[in-house]
Amino acid sequence: MGAPGQVTLQVYVKHGCETCDRARKIAQLVDAEFPEVSVEIVDMNESQPQREDVFAVPTYVLEDHILSLGNPQESELREEIKALLRVRGLV
């Protein structure tokens, strides 16, 4: 997980998943825009998910809570992250 004081976003993907390519790009955008967010790409081809509730890809998990099955609207993802950062006092 992320360093203390950081928020963690995990994005579960698989090779050959067309929408997962977009998920990787969204993850890169979040990583560039929010230095307070630790972004982790979890490739389900390489390892089994540690979560039983991740059964589809892409899946976005923000601070241990499933935020989206499938790619969210970028604006909605930004708002969710900003809201969590405000609650945590990181912005």
Annotate the PLM regions.
Residues 1-33:
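Local sequence-structure signature of Cys/Sec-based thiol-disulfide redox active-site neighborhoods
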Residues 22-23, 53, 73:
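Residues at alpha-helix caps and immediate loop-helix transition turns in enzyme cores, especially N-
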Residues 35-48:
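Thiol-based oxidoreductase modules, predominantly thioredoxin-like and allied folds used
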Residues 52-61:
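Structural micro-motif
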Residues 62-91:
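Non-catalytic, surface beta->alpha helical segment in thiol-disulfide oxidoreductase systems
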